[in-house]
UniProtKB/Swiss-Prot annotation:
Organism: Trichoderma asperellum (strain ATCC 204424 / CBS 433.97 / NBRC 101777)
Role noted for this protein: Aerial growth, conidiation, and dispersal of filamentous fungi in the environment rely upon a capability of their secreting small amphipathic proteins called hydrophobins (HPBs) with low sequence identity. Class I can self-assemble into an outermost layer of rodlet bundles on aerial cell surfaces, conferring cellular hydrophobicity that supports fungal growth, development and dispersal; whereas Class II form highly ordered films at water-air interfaces through intermolecular interactions but contribute nothing to the rodlet structure.
Pfam families hit by this protein: Hydrophobin_2
Protein's gene: HFB2-4
Taxonomy, superkingdom: Eukaryota
Family: Belongs to the cerato-ulmin hydrophobin family.
Name this protein carries in UniProt: Class II hydrophobin 4
């Protein structure tokens, strides 16, 4: 009986452990809600993105993301959920300031 308890505990710990290793670098947008990189024409009230599109290239870092969006006159933002070119919740991309 103790063996099954120990085996179940070991299996639970193994399953609960993270599968991928995160180094902390190279992330443009934070994980979670604001995980969609967008190039937006304008940002209203600091939270609403208008005229948003996916970047034309895959950015390497925040500065590259800012440069990609700047080519079309847009701002580099991380948004919650793009709907028809409008994003209700956006924040500045990491390293794009």
């Amino acid at each position: 009986m103790k063996f099954f308890t120990a085996a179940a505990l070991f299996a639970a710990v193994a399953i609960a452990g993270p599968v991928e290793v995160r180094t902390g670098g190279g992330s443009i947008c934070p994980d979670g809600l604001f995980s969609n990189p967008q190039c937006c024409d304008t940002q209203l009230l600091g939270i609403i993105g208008l005229g948003c599109e996916v970047p034309s290239q895959t950015p390497r870092d925040g500065a590259d993301f800012k440069n990609i969006c700047a080519k079309t006159g847009d701002q580099a933002l991380c948004c919650v959920l793009p709907i028809a070119g409008q994003d209700l919740l956006c924040q500045a991309a990491v390293g794009a300031a």
